[in-house]
Amino acid sequence: MDTPVILFGAFDRHNFGDMLFPHVAAAMLPDREPIFAGLAERDLRAEGGHRVEALSAVAAWLGERPATLIHVGGEILSCDAWQAAVMLAPPGEAQRLVARLDARPHEQREWAARMLGTDARAPYATAARAAFRGPLRIAYLAVGGVELDACDEALRAEVLAALAAADDVSVRDRRTQAQLQAAGIAARLAPDRQ
């Protein structure tokens, strides 16, 4: 039995650009049938996306079996839990949440942790390792973090630790690559023809 491959990213929301990433990543794995996972379960097939499983459900289903998880594209390195949770909320609710909690960072973090089921500060970039009980190979494919240097120190430290522990890292822009290199993390530029 092949080790399951999980494509994980911010394609669990209605954003056309983010919904393209798993199509490209799946095409790079022609002999595999990847599992598409996000922070939330969504069925975006009607919009050209995928049926996306919640990461926590995929981890529970796999139990202690080994897996490979590929973080797929997007500006996930600097996307904090509050931003991720608001993006996953229904549009009307998102506007009310922002109005109510905009100047309350502590309450934002508490609400986001409840909504997402994780305390990760940058959940699209760092929640995977803690979710799985079995051996997990982790790769980052063409991820971005142009604003990582502007994020708070705790988020930056969490992201850099996750990247340092990864089996492979590629980024989508030179600025992110330079920031990671300055932190001692080697990251290839993908696509590599830029």
What role is predicted for each listed range?
Residues 1-162, 194:
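Aromatic- and Gly/Pro-rich donor/ligand-binding loops
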Residues 18, 173-174:
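Helix N-cap/beta->alpha junction signal
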Residues 26-30, 174-181:
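Class I S-adenosyl-L-methionine
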Residues 134, 165, 183-185:
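Short, structured coil segments at secondary-structure junctions
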Residues 167-171:
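A short beta-strand/loop micro-motif in the catalytic core of glycosyltransferases
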Residues 177-194:
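Helix-loop-beta element that forms the nucleotide-linked donor phosphate-binding surface
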